[in-house]
């Protein structure tokens, strides 16, 4: 199966040297970093926001740092991120935040997709008002909203960056269960989890794990 995400000889000073990673549709990789700044920098590099010192980041065999602005924008439409910051727009209601990518790219939110979003929120244990501004949400509710927004955009690549680290245990398990359920679908995206330190995710069984706290990274493959 062709690679959807590929990191070739990727070097980011202070984080990793000569990292090689390849993810195909439906596969899951886990990267452990030594700190929050390392996680953020790796995320920015993977999604094309910050060039590495050397090496390449490819999505669908296209090197992100050789693309022009329009080409990069087109590639990013197939990538969804769920981060510790959640990325919700403060002056948009929760539901508007969740549906914004669909409206922006397609101009419509199909009824079936809206129903899927509401069901996901319920499964995650969301108790907030979807018509309130995100400033009223708890941290866990902000992450839930960000996850649902990512899922309903039907990405080909999901990147989870530190979004699970500070969640209360039950919320973490709920979100991880839904992330795993997504990976069990026939059209599952590739998924990259980036976490900090020794956070344990017992429900997650990645195809490959990279511990970037070591140089060279410790690599564990699922057998």
Regions found by a protein language model. Give the residues of each.
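Conserved ABC ATPase "signature" region
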Residues: 112-129
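Helix-to-loop junction immediately C-terminal to a conserved catalytic motif
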Residues: 47
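ABC-type ATPase nucleotide-binding domains, specifically the catalytic core motifs of the NBD
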Residues: 99-112, 123
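Q-loop/switch helix immediately C-terminal to the Walker
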Residues: 85, 91-104, 116
């Amino acid at each position: 199966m062709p690679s959807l995400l590929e990191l070739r000889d990727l070097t980011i000073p202070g984080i990793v040297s000569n990292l090689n990673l390849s993810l195909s549709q439906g596969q899951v990789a886990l990267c452990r970093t030594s700190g929050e700044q390392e996680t953020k920098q790796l995320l920015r590099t993977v999604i094309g926001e910050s060039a590495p010192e050397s090496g390449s980041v490819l999505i669908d065999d296209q090197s992100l740092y050789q693309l022009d602005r329009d080409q990069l924008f087109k590639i990013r439409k197939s990538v969804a991120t769920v981060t510790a910051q959640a990325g919700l727009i403060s002056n948009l209601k929760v539901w508007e935040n969740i549906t914004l990518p669909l409206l922006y790219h397609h101009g419509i939110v199909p009824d079936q997709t809206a129903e899927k979003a509401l069901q996901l929120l319920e499964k995650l244990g969301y108790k907030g008002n979807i018509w309130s501004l995100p400033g009223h949400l708890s941290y866990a509710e902000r992450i839930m909203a960000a996850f649902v927004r990512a899922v309903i955009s039907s990405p080909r690549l999901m990147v989870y960056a530190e979004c699970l680290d500070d969640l209360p245990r039950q919320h973490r398990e709920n979100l991880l269960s839904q992330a795993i359920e997504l990976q069990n679908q026939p059209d599952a995206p590739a998924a990259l989890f980036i976490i900090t330190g020794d956070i344990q995710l017992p429900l997650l069984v990645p195809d490959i794990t990279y511990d970037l706290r070591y140089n060279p990274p410790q690599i564990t493959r699922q057998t």
